[in-house]
Swiss-Prot record:
General factor that plays a role in the activation of archaeal genes transcribed by RNA polymerase. Binds specifically to the TATA box promoter element which lies close to the position of transcription initiation. Sequence repeats lie at residues 8-84, 99-175. The keyword Transcription applies. This is TATA-box-binding protein. Keywords: DNA-binding, Repeat, Transcription, Transcription regulation. Belongs to the TBP family. InterPro entries: TBP (IPR000814), TBP_archaea (IPR033711), TBP_CS (IPR030491), TBP_dom_sf (IPR012295). One of its GO terms (molecular function) is DNA-binding transcription factor activity. The keyword DNA repair does not apply. It holds the Pfam family TBP. GO terms for biological process: DNA-templated transcription initiation. It comes from the Archaea.
Length: 183
């Protein structure tokens, strides 16, 4: 595989707590909370360490965003649940945490002619009047890459960092095969 490094920029994880939550009771009892039902159907609870935001919904669903590694994402969810438990809200001990999306960035180290890439590479969308990047959809791994003329890449839709890395590596190799970049 080609030598390319990725940097995880954001991880989105979710948990279903199996119990509805009384947001009007929870919101005033927590610090660093934004709660305005007219603007958003849940409350936003910000943690400082790890620096994340947890979206808490009345249905008992929780979404954590902002972590740079899976461990921090899981830790943030557990910290959020512990804070809710401190408010005399019973939450089952066992609940499932799912990684929904990992966003990673990379640099191919080469300038890309996106018009040529759009013509030669399958499963792409490129509308420079709408967005400066080219959208490239891979089926294995099932990720979406945004390619920019500078050679910078953003990978989204991965469930693991390895999937994101593989997506970027396969893309670089395909671009080399099509003579769209040099090795």
């Amino acid at each position: 595989m080609s030598d390319v490094e990725i940097k995880v920029e954001n991880i989105v994880a979710s948990a279903t707590l199996g119990k509805s939550l009384e947001l009007p009771k929870i919101a005033p009892a927590l610090e660093n909370v934004e709660y305005n039902l007219e603007q958003f159907p849940g409350l936003v609870f910000k943690l400082k360490d790890p620096k994340t935001a947890a979206l808490i919904f009345g249905s008992g669903k929780l979404v954590c965003t902002g972590a740079k590694c899976i461990e921090d994402s899981i830790k943030a969810i557990h910290m959020t649940v512990d804070k809710i438990r401190e408010l005399d809200t019973e939450i089952p001990e066992e609940f499932e945490i799912k990684i929904q999306n990992i966003v990673a960035s990379a640099n191919l180290g080469k300038v890309l002619n996106l018009e040529a890439v759009a013509l030669d590479l399958e499963n792409t969308e490129y509308e420079p009047e709408q967005f400066p990047g080219l959208v490239y959809r891979l089926s294995d791994p099932k990720v979406v890459l945004l390619l920019f003329g500078s050679g910078k890449v953003v990978c989204t839709g991965a469930k693991t960092a390895d999937q994101a890395l593989l997506g970027v590596q396969k893309t670089k190799e395909r671009l080399i095969e099509l003579y769209l970049i040099e090795e």
